[in-house]
Amino acid sequence: MRTVDRPNEVHYDFEESCYVEGDSQSLVKVKAKSDPPARGGEQCAVLPVFQAAFLVQDVDTNSYMILNPATAQWFFTRPLGGCEMFVAKGSTRQDVLVIHSNLDRCRNKVGNLQEKGASVDEMMGRHPGYHLIARVYSEPPAAEKPAADAYMRGYERGHPGILTIAYNNQPPTTLQYFQFIGHYNDAQYWIFTVKGEIDGKVFGRIQVR
């Protein structure tokens, strides 16, 4: 279900629309419920442990979802190519709010970083039961990096304890999109992984403990 909280802010409820196949925490493939499972993988389509929540990316919007591991133990969103992800924790480590920020109204990277950070801070004010624990962002071009780094240092000071992870799609690194995958593991906490879609390089992990 899609609920527009306000302009540029949309809440998505979990719908049983996808599941995962794979053999490890990050080597998985998400499939629509309408897709037949691979031979031998029939259980993936029906067992709760394989169910996945998918967060839609909306244009110029902060899309968010509150995860429920009793319903789905995997989380996916659209591949990242400049968007940011924010993770907020509620009163328990099972209670997690995830935001896909696709605001892109500024002409420069530093402006985009500032706008996304400020908009999510404002949003958190409307969700007082949650606090931000992580932010995933794309590194800017070299010319903007000093100003962006200065902004991020100030952002981290204003958000004590927050984990920030940068992914890099600037040359000479591999030109690719990036996956943001969440898994509620056997130890009963969420782990989110940021990794390259082509080279598989892991840029960081977020553990919600």
Feature map (PLM): residue ranges:
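Active-site microenvironment for binding and transforming phosphate-containing groups
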Residues: M1-R209
